[in-house]
UniProtKB/Swiss-Prot annotation:
Superkingdom, natural source: Eukaryota
Family stated for the protein in its record: Belongs to the GAPT family.
BP term (GO), one: B cell proliferation involved in immune response
Main localization (coarse): membrane
Gene name per UniProt: GAPT
Reported effect, residue 145 to A: Abolishes interaction with GRB2
Protein name: Protein GAPT
Length: 157
């Protein structure tokens, strides 16, 4: 009799806990549906399209604005800054100018080419001794042709 009473008590406690879990989930769903309009899922800023970024920025900046030193830029520095802005990799690539590369004083080849005279008999590393493969020559075919032909015959059983 005591075993059946224990089983009933366990079943009732599991049932009540599942019922409470169901009630909590229901309240959470109702709260989410009521507040769904206020909180919308948005992508991170770098994944948004440029037009949607403008909409988000205009919505967020409708309140009072604080203007710092960054916004007070003269015309000369603004032109320079817009030219530098094209090189920023975080900006959108819509307004980047494309064209042939500009001629520079030094080309990449001149920068990386080793123009210094080097002694080829010296090793690159001072402590390296000459190895067996340093003056390696391919074996020459013998000038005397071999008259013997070698045949390998299978074992006969």
């Amino acid at each position: 009799m005591s075993k059946s009473c224990g089983n009933n008590l366990a079943a009732i406690s599991v049932g009540i806990s599942l019922l409470l879990l169901l009630v909590v989930c229901g309240i959470g769903c109702v709260w989410h549906w009521k507040h769904r309009v206020a909180t919308r899922f948005t992508l991170p800023r770098f994944l948004q399209r440029r037009s949607s970024r403008r909409k988000v920025c205009t919505k967020t900046f409708l309140g009072p604005r604080i203007i710092g030193l960054r916004h007070e830029i003269s015309v000369e520095t603004q032109d320079h800054k817009s030219a530098v802005r094209g090189n920023n990799t975080h900006d959108n690539y819509e307004n980047v100018e494309a064209g042939p590369p500009k001629a520079k004083g030094k080309t990449d080849k001149e920068l990386y080419e080793n123009t210094g005279q080097s002694n080829f008999e010296e090793h690159i590393y001072g402590n390296e001794t000459s190895s067996d493969y340093y003056n390696f020559q391919k074996p020459r075919p013998s000038e005397v042709p071999q008259d013997e032909d070698i045949y390998i015959l299978p074992d006969s059983y």
